[in-house]
From Swiss-Prot:
GO terms for molecular function: metal ion binding. SUPFAM superfamilies: Concanavalin A-like lectins/glucanases (SSF49899). The keyword Repeat applies. This is Neurexin-3b. It comes from Danio rerio. Residues 1676-1686 have a biased composition (Basic and acidic residues).
Amino acid sequence: MPPHCQPHCVLLLLSTFLSLGLGLEFTGSEGQWARYLRWDASTRSDLSFQFKTAISDALVLYFDDGGYCDFLLLSIEDAKLKLRFSVDCAETTITSDKMVNDSHWHFATISRHNLRTVLALDGDSKVDEVRPQRQFMKIVSDLYLGGVPQDIRTSALTLPAAKEMPPFKGIITDLGYGNKVPTRLGSQKVRLEMEGFCTENPCENGGSCSMADGEAYCDCSKTGYTGRYCNEAVNKTPGFAHMVKSPQAREENVATFRGSEYFCYDLSQNPIQSSSDEITLSFKTWQRNGLILHTGKSADYVNLALKDGAVSLVINLGSGAFEAIVEPVNGKFNDNAWHDIKVTRNLRQHSGIGHAMVNKLHCLVTISVDGILTTTGYTQEDYTMLGSDDFFYVGGSPSTADLPGSPVSNNFMGCLKEVVYKNNDIRLELSRLARIADPKMKLQGDIVFKCENVPTLDPISFETAESFLGLPKWNTKRVGSISFDFRTSEPNGLILFTQGKPQDKKDSRSQRSNKVDFFAVELLDGHLYLLLDMGSGTIKVKATQNKVNDGVWHHVDIQRDGRSGIISVNSRRTPFTASGENEILDLEGNLYLGGLPDNRADLILPTELWTAMLNYGYVGCIRDLFIDGRSKDIRQIAEAQNVGGIKSSCSKVTAKQCDSNSCKNNGICKEGWNRFICDCTGTGYWDRTCEREASILSYDGSMYMKVVMPTIIHTEAEDVSLRFMSQRAFGLLMAATSRESADTLRLELDSGRVKLIVNLGKGPETLYAGQKVNDNDWHSVRVTRRGKNIKLMVDDDVAEGQMNGDHTRLEFSNVETGILTERRFASTAPSNFIGHLQGLKFNGLLYIDMCKNGDIEFCELNARFGMRSIVADPVTFKTKGSYLGLATLQAYSTMHLFFQFKTTSGDGFILFNSGDGNDFIAVELVKGYIHYVFNLGNGPSLLKGNSDSPLNDNQWHNVVITRDASNTHTLKVDAKSVSQVVNGAKNLDLKGDLFVAGLGPNMYQNLPKLVVPREGFQGCLASMDLNGRLPDLINDALFRSGQIERGCEGPSTTCQEDSCANMGVCIQQWENFTCDCSMTSYSGTQCNDPGATYIFGKGGGLIMYTWPNNERPSTRTDRLAVGFSTTIKDGILVRIDSAPRLGDYIMLHIEEGKVCVTFNIGTVDISVKEMTTEVNDGKYHVVRFTRNGGNATLQVDNWPINEHFPSGNSDIERFQMANKKIPFKYTRPVEDWLHEKDRQLTIFNTQATISIGGNDRKRPYQGQLSGLYYNGLKVLNMAAEGHTNIKINGSVRLVGDVPTSRSPSRTTTSMPPEMSTTFIETTTTLSTTTTRKQRSPPTIQTTDDIVSSAECSSDDEDLEECDGGHTGGELVIPVLVEDPIDIPPISTRVPFIPLPPTLHPVLTIIETTKESLSIATEAGVPCFSDQGRDDCDDDDGDDDDGDGLVISGFGSGEVFDSSLPPTDDEDFYTTFSLVTDKILTTSTYEGGYKALAPKWEEKDFKPKKPSEVGRITAIPPLPDLRSSAASPVRPEPAPKIPAGKMNNREVKPQPDIVLLPLPTSFDMDGTKPKGPYITQPMLRTIPSALPTVPGIRRVPPGASEVIRESSSTTGMVVGIVSAAALCILILLYAMYKYRNRDEGSYQVDETRNYISNSAQNNGTVVKDKQPSTKGASNKRPKDKDKEYYV
């Protein structure tokens, strides 16, 4: 007898039937209820019961927390169960799908699990959860069934509506709290269901049950048995006689099976031999699969099972199996209802074609379920006898998967009743024999002989890829089985994995020698795979043809016997056979379900298991896990292990998860299983929603990061992704390398492309992707390898390939970045990387972030975290005579050069290498701009960097020079690049040494054409990359000369006297300084850019800022500053008011032309006034006001400070001052309050509004306001940005763009120079043009603009009147008259705001029309570079811009195209490309160039209509063309301005220039003339300029006196004629130069002198010799440099 059938002592306690809980019958009467002891559902607990009813609406169950928040209500609404509950006032509802008003029994369960609650009805579960602050439910009341007592106060109910709900009508039974029966405390209008004792009949052998006096009695009269329960036989006969019963004695015996129980009847003593037989039984279960009954072995057996909710029958009588499947019409048989099965087999005569005998005997097999569903068939051939001498298994077996013909591998779970086998000779009542413990019946497990509820094996959901369960060891050696159901929509995931002990531990560092047995099931790309290794090699079996990640349940059944086995997925069977001869699967470790733990030190993962290598955990549902036929309650295991990310239910959310746009920072959202999956590759972020910024590593060529693996890793699949930023064309990004082999997976930069090298030991495979990725921008790289297939993606560029050979395994022990350290097996080593790396992810592991956070210990690192400025191996050349030599530059076919430099010198050689013939390459610095000169045999060519400003600003700059296979040369300086395609020769033949930073003796005299510098480079060079070679400038030098040192300290950046302009305050910081410009009205890093500027027109305007009610400040001190320009005598500039009825205010206004501030802080009006000088002179002034309590100061520009101090200091004097304004009845309360609070009337209370413009006070201001600052608020900036708290009304117009006001307390950040509005007027020096061939045409604005003074001088009709009543007029071009006045050679840019049109004659805007331009062009006006080609053609055949006058200025704030690229020409810093020897010093604000002209008064003629504001050119007089004169202003260059903020050039002094209101020179000596005295020819109808005050005035530093003089008509005509004649001469000269130019190269003026920049930066360590200021100012310009201004 097998050991599994050893006898077990089973005691049947008949009293068990009497312990059944009584059912309750609810009649539906008003006031009915049943009350049970409180159910503790606060955190985790289950409640279950059975019920049946016929009504559609009723209260079933209720409890709460006594009237506060928490409650649980189960009711029937619309014939469906509805669960409504609340935790901490967070409420939700669950409704079942099934109707329950069918008078059938239903089983309901309520499961509480912290915030999650599950409602299960007949096996179908619905789940929901709430998210309150409290994590548990409070329960105070008892549990009420069927209704709520009416005497309970409504206020004591959390849900008072429960009292009004219809009462329940029906029966509720088997109420249980978990495994316990609750105590019933009382009931009303509810009766016990007395028949409940007989529901499970305790009478055996067909006895009938009846109730009397509350007890059950059995009627045994018709059974042939006696005893209380009809269990005592009257007589017994040998053999099977005691089992044969009369037809009337219908036995009804039941047993409960839970997956591990079964019983078997031993047939060895009485074998079965029958030709006809019958099997009957009843079953009730929730389970989908399970063995019901089996007898026989080998090829002679009967198997009855439940398979996927259907009944399966397999009969084999020796020659082949007869199989039948019975399925219900609707639903499944696993519905926890009783179903009856009957199987019969009878001998029948069967005739058919092909049979030798016509009437041959066959067995007719019939199976029926519930007496309705019937399937009939015949067994094969003539085997008619069933012979069995084995066992009769009921409910299961020791190894169900090994039973012959078994379609399932797990045992039955549920109830089996009246299992009977009978044939012609015997009747085996198997259920009864088990219950009475017949000696031949052997029981396995704890079998209960009554039908108990066996809950279904609840599914669990793995919600994250990191969640997993650890199950006990799978004890399988030779045979075993595993079955489960899974459901997911995700394509990848590890479902099962377990392994054995290592067979060999000779080398713990290598996986190769640690061979272990393992078993795994994985989902890969939607297909299911079985992996098995029994010691002789791994097999990988694909078990599906179609993808199974479709979101529906799939059943998997795996059965193994020795080396062979079958995996079945949804009944599709796939056989497999393990390698080798071994038949033992030796497993020792845990069986992991859903994934693997983070700590895998004890795991030896097979390379063939790709999901483990790639860290793909399973996300989805698992249910019905059976191991060797025994169920595993994985829900209970999950709760016991308390694993995060696992939920004890399974439901699919119908809504798309990506609809919520949950992936931040441009992450790509993908649909997962009840989750969204964010692909953060290429975003620079990581984490679940791409919200966590990935760490950045900065590499300077000597830095690296190396992750050393604890063991040698072998993989067949890799996922690698990273981001990088670099200006280098070569360098190692990452490499997986091995210490033991040549295996590698390497990503590197190669000639500006990304190169992937994969070597698996049989030679490298190479892929390229991306183009010109060395652009100092972020690029994302992704590598995917699956076996032999590899894919490389760089941004949107994709390259795919396939590995050659049979090798698919990659061996590596390191992951390296920056520098390749494992070079033993590398044939060539890549260049070291210089740049930034971010987001390196290798097979799911973020190595950079793990290294930073200390999550891995085996990380070698010297690269620096953070986005750091990379300066690699800097070297300082301390003198212009210092230089060194390197080996010849290898750049024959292509070239990629990179270096960084930092200098204060404007000129010098950087690189030079000569070659064969005329070939050479030179990189030089000319006037602060990079020049790249080369000759490939076609003649010299030049590329000039187009930087915004000179580069000798003591800042690091990056230079990239490339030449590709198409002979396209590119020069990139910082972020700006220029390119040129050169035809002809493509190879660069270089020989000799590469000179760095200078040339050797006597080499400057023999330089090629277009090479300019005649001296060496003085400054710092770093990060030199010569076509992938990273030289050490010191150690690799072939020779050196002069003072050369490592490192680069550079000039200091400490605060100097002139660090901040316009009285800005210099703030010293650790490595730099910043300027506080808050009280200057200026902005920018040096306080020399204008602030936000508004023009208030004659109609009056108002800008109103209102504080939010809850943010109104009260201050003891105030600071106010604003710049303005006006001619009015009275008006309010700014007024700050307190809340209504308080009366506090501060008002800045003009009275009688003088600035005054009046304020009141609760006493009397206090005024501070500038009494000496009027400010309504049309000039730009800055007024500063400060208050501290009652003390106040007022200062205009840098004039003397006006101060005010209170006359009284005591509280009484202050109160007496305030008493004059306090009503009599409030005097005493106020006095008491003042004494109590010790408040001395120094607080400006509850400030509510800031009013600008005075229009609300009937004292409108007219003019310009700029850079208003008040207590940290830049109100005008805020207005320009459209702040929500600011309202603008009336005639108010914004001028141009403004700096941001987002950081009102900091004014140290300025816009780029091209966005500055500092330059007001522009000056143009008329000179010849030297053009250079083969340059790209400049991108310029092509509007057709010309001066037309006969129209309105502004486009704002609200600001001025325009009357065209006057006719006539003439175009005036004032001729500049040289004046020998001593003028300082340095001036600064001046902020300007156009003045209102109603003032006295001051500078204003000249406008143009397209028509006027056409007239001018036809009249032969010189062409300007900002005109289009259609209207501007100099007919010289080249694409230069001509040599016309360019007159430009600043005007009305009209928005123009700002995309005009500035040139890098030595003397020309505007958008007119490659034009030399011109000076156009201007603001490129918004790309618009505007000019200024006098404003006509009423007595003069006025234009008729407005036109567009445009650019201005000078033309000869035209008939009937009305005109006006423009007063030019030339800003003076600034002395010693910190790096990069101004054009640091020496500008020749030009006399007769009008300087607008406030210059920004900071020469503190006010006795020196601050600029030239100006004469300006005007129209005779315009009066003289405003007179100036005699004597020496207190003027701002650097200010210029403006003197306007009337000119006669004769002088004006002379000027016009002179200008016209000069223009014609210039045009002829330009045509001559063009016709005689050198066709093979650019024209070069060899006689030009390149003067070093004299405006050095603050604190430079090495400075050029400064030219004499005095000499420069006294020298008269030559006649050929006459200048014309409009």
